[in-house]
Amino acid sequence: MKRHFLIILIVLFQLSLYAQSKKEVKKHKIKASAVSVIENGKTINESKTIFDANGNEIEATDYNKDGTIKEIHKTKYNSKGDEVEDEQYDANNKFVEKKITKYNASGEKSEEIFYDAIGKLTKKHIYTYDGKGLRTERKTTDAEGKIISIKKYVYVTK
């Protein structure tokens, strides 16, 4: 019984680390966190995250149920702490996709540009905002600039 209690306590501690905000990660100088689940007496790793000194998530590894790596994301940030680049790798650490994020003068996300493993543009997300800075639309285009989808955002304020 003590062993089960200890395992549950460890899992809860790991979940609480993973669930921490960027501010808390920085404040407590957390360098890494891991999330695992115990199913039918077997411990299954779900994810591992590495943070920089500013609390930014710089590497995230997701695992399959059998414990093998599913995918890895490596992320870079600008001086304001905004994500500017995310590289995705497969289970064999082979580069799959790169996402570049751009921001407008107000610091709002304006574009996400996706490239495949050979550097070819695959799609773009283009964001628009209203006068209050609220996101109103996300337009997705293919490599040729053809609109694939439009996502509208509506806010109820009263």
Go through the PLM ranges and name each one:
Residues M1-K23:
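Bacterial Sec-dependent N-terminal signal peptides
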Residues Q20-K158:
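Buried hydrophobic residues that stabilize the cores of well-folded domains
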